[in-house]
């Protein structure tokens, strides 16, 4: 007797009697409940442990009204859309990594949790996808609204004492711009002045006068001078740059050996527990050492003791800036750029007392001058070097003169090297991969941070501010939810016990 299968039933068929027995396997009732009319509460449809519910409980969103009150008219015009809802819509987009505002609105239409979070009923019409864009252009453009939202959420994290700013980790990542790499033009652009330009010029002239040289006159930088720490010291220098015709504010960035794209550089600072403390947005073709000051100005007053950064920030200017402000810079070893087969700069020993260098053949390189980039030049005697057995490993100059440069702020770099070799600093630097680099990975993997659909630096700053705000708030909401019915003090003690080192744990338990 054969078995016959249907979509929902298993049949046993008797060929002799032409009968069959039915064995129910599954129930088909998909179409029976579509036309039902039910009464329910929106709040009951959202699980108690849903992320949006936790976020809504973690912060009072009414602070947005105070931030936008001056953007709305009080005595004329028709009623506007609720500003809190207006901000929550892109917040949902960046929280869940939805690719566009149009897709976000489609998701809100069918997602009960999204509607509950926005305060919409099941039959309420969802705002048009262009509503936020129009409000941004007419109300929020050229304002710091989104940075204030980020700061307000960060204050909540400080209120719960979850942030430890003693060790701050700084790094930058690139976000691909919405620009075709084939649609570009070349233009002549002025090099931006460095943040230390005036101070460097003053100290260069003081150094020259101390060596019996005349102060430098105001003129364009000599192209033969070596580059200063992070770039040219003359803000008027011109250079040819590639500019996107789609997004002129983005920068041409070398993503790999064979791939170039237009992108934005996002510099970020976080503490050792992964809380984002600040950010800055710049074109992708600007070096991290040049744009560091824009981020540093935002975080320098939060109580930093040690600032950890990669080799891109290891310049004399940044080392001096941090040490003068009482901050310990933890910067890694930087491989020398010396050509293969030649002596490295470290093999030339500097004599601080006589202010000279001694080469591997025990010959003196005496002080010659201080150039416009802030480097002292030490030169050897060509007649002595002509018969040196190490000449081919030292220089290829026609006059057999070896030139070694030393920045006037080199003592600050030497101090950084001493800090790097201090016991325990190697372990602190290794935390970069667990803090700031992990943040970039999370943002790109879960929050749509690999590329941007926004055009322009201002819109990109809005995206970065809301993305980092939602990452901090997501983390805060989950930690508050773990507290449950326990008191605030016990929860904070548990959090500190989990996050801090074993030695600190004993102190906390003794309290």
Q: How should these model regions be labeled?
A:
Residues 3, 10-13, 18-21, 496-499:
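Short, positively charged and aromatic/hydrophobic N-terminal segments
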Residues 8, 90, 97-110, 120-511:
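Anion-binding and metal-coordination hotspots
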Residues 14-53:
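Hydrophobic alpha-helical membrane-insertion signals
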Residues 35, 48, 61, 82, ...:
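Generic alpha-helical segment signature
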Residues 48-91, 96-97, 408:
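Basic, short loop/linker segments at the boundary and entry of helix-turn-helix/winged-helix-like folds
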Residues 24, 73-77, 424-427:
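A ubiquitous short alpha-helical element
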Residues 28-32, 78-80, 122:
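A short, ordered amphipathic alpha-helix with a cationic face
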Residues 115-119:
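Short arginine-rich
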